[in-house]
């Protein structure tokens, strides 16, 4: 399967099968941490696997949809790249997004579904899960097997025309 086909087939899963995620599958996903590009290859991204604390996580977001595993993506604020030209600009959130996208697409390749979650309170999550103060939570990602009746959202395949999204300089 080519990249474009893989990317088009991927969708946000909102209903997961009652089937555990095998450690081998999780390990294959986490290998993406080693190959995804990050600014200056500093690799400040951390992933916390949350299979054991799903009930605690359910108190912080309604977006788990029965997934057997949730990955939490953080970055180490002491290790991300800082832009010396513009203060306050650093790479942590971008690095996390790149790694998370790699994991999301690898999951699709492996026959797994994912849900990218931004609908949670990062500070409350950091407190509830004792995230070190030098790490910042960026997103959560559900991972598991999609239920047989799971399907893409109604607007999944709708896109704006390309000329509305591209500006040539």
Where are the predicted features?
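Acidic, surface-exposed loops and disordered segments
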Residues: 1-169
């Amino acid at each position: 399967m080519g990249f474009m086909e893989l990317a088009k087939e991927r969708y946000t899963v909102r209903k997961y099968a009652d089937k555990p995620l095998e450690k081998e599958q999780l390990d294959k996903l986490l290998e993406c941490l080693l190959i995804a590009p990050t600014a200056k290859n500093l690799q400040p991204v951390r992933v916390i696997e949350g299979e054991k604390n799903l009930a605690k996580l359910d108190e912080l977001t309604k977006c788990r949809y029965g997934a057997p595993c949730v990955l939490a993506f953080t970055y180490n604020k002491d290790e991300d790249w800082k832009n010396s030209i513009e203060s306050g600009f650093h790479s942590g959130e971008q690095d996390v997004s790149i790694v998370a996208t790699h994991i999301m697409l690898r999951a699709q390749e492996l026959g797994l579904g994912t849900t990218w979650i931004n609908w949670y309170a990062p500070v409350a999550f950091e407190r509830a899960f004792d995230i070190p103060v030098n790490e910042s939570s960026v997103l959560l990602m559900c991972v598991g097997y999609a239920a047989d009746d799971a399907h893409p959202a109604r607007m999944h395949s709708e896109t704006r025309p390309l000329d509305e999204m591209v500006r040539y300089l």
